[in-house]
């Protein structure tokens, strides 16, 4: 534990010492791996109702350096008389701005209060964490960045190559920031970037013990841009975002694997074609009485279709085991082994659109995962009330096959409501 803390301290001191001694220009966010900024201000509400009328709107921020957001979340289970499964209050407090003449920085803190009816209340009543914090400097043809943020690899979010940042889970796919040191070198029509993570985040059940130590994670991306098309080559040693249970000893492990990948996109008249492919070496896998390492080929193909405000996304994903035997196993959610298939196919279709002068937005999606072992359908309705207020209503339903990895999620139903104020 002490060694881990010392490594992180040395990592931060080295990074800040290096960054504070460079001469930078003002192009802070040209980097492909720069943090994806959160949504900006919402369009002004055009309704005449005085519930959120002109008095509620602030024409000019009194504290322009302060970003404040308060979100109230509720979750209900329709299958159990709409019992409350989620009731929490989240507060985000952040600031951003220039650091001398050479850089830019952002800091955001997130505090969460779990109420007694929330499913997390029994284990955690409140939480405070650094949601994101980074410094970025640019000088000549170089850009460097250190802090806690997200790195997006590949063309498709959550696809074969987008494996650096873990997601919040099956029903919450948003990426979780991690602590990185990264650098990018820009050329005329290409760029070369590197990242290093001394303590990758690994998701696991709180009831399970992570058996192995944490490994370092690092990677390289070389991208080439041309008119109407982009492509990139990826190399790295990565740690699985989700720990895998060893069915033999009951412990969970997250040992590194090696990745070589290629991604590209091509713009056509009516759609954007996206393609990723990655060879992954030394991926952990269960076999009857054994815990082994295998090679796997992952790929995905997606069509991003934009028609005015309506957007369609259609994708296909494959995970193909190059090494395979009939006694390979996949752990279920409950930790029981089920038969593994050589090729796992997943499909996704989503559509979204806006109406009411773009104050309202709706979305529908359907995900078929693991050769139809799981079928997830969801719907969302968002309302941008005015510059400060936003509301969102969503619903999720899961149908899962018996005696397969996701069987415990069969007939999963949730209705979620969020109300957000931002300043």
Predicted region positions:
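Hydrophobic, lipid-facing positions within transmembrane beta-strands of outer-membrane proteins
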Residues: 87-93, 128-133, 177-181, 216-220, ...
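Outer-membrane beta-barrel "beta-signal"
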Residues: 397, 409-423
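Transmembrane beta-barrel strands of outer-membrane/channel proteins
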Residues: 66-74, 107-113, 146-148, 194-198, ...
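Outer membrane beta-barrel
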Residues: 96-202, 400
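N-terminal periplasmic/intermembrane-space "pro-region" immediately following the signal or transit peptide
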Residues: 22-84, 94, 122
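Detector for outer-membrane/organellar transmembrane beta-barrel domains
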Residues: 265-367
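Repeated loop/turn-to-beta-strand initiation elements of outer-membrane beta-barrel proteins
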Residues: 64-66, 101-107, 141-144, 189-194, ...
